[in-house]
C-alpha cells in the first residue's frame, strides 16, 4: 500500500499539468471550444424578458411543469411549440475568472487526491509505470470525462460539444496517469 503522503508530489504536479492543459484548450486554442456556445439574435429582448420575470441565479426549464401536468394538453402544446430547454443563470455582475479558475484547480486537486487514494490501495510501491498509468488513467478518465456525459443526455448540451469535453477529459487523464506513473514511489 502507498500512502497519500507518499503521493503528494504527483497529486500536486498532475493538478498543475491538467490546469495548464485546460487553459491551453479553453483560452489559447480558440477554435476548440469557442464555437460551442452562441448568443440569441435578439439577446437584448431575451435579457429584458428574463429581468422582467425577476429570475435570480439558478436553473430554469422552459416550458416548466410539474410531473402531474405532463399529460395536460396545454402543457403538451407548449412542448410542441417550443422552445424547449434549460437555462442557467448566474448572479448579475462581472465574470470573476479568478474564482472560476480557483475552483477548477481545487477540482483538479480533488481528482488527483481520489486517484492517489484509489491507486495507493490497489498498487504497491515499485509497481511498473504502465500498471500505474492504466490504473490512475482509468480513474482520472472517469472523473474528468464521463461525469459530464449526462449533461448531453438529460440537459440538452450539444453532443458535438460534449464529445470535445470527453476528449479534454482523456487528455487530462493521460497527463494525470503519466505524472503518477513517472513519480510513483519505488
Report residues per predicted region:
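Juxtamembrane/disordered regions of integral membrane proteins
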Residues: 1-186
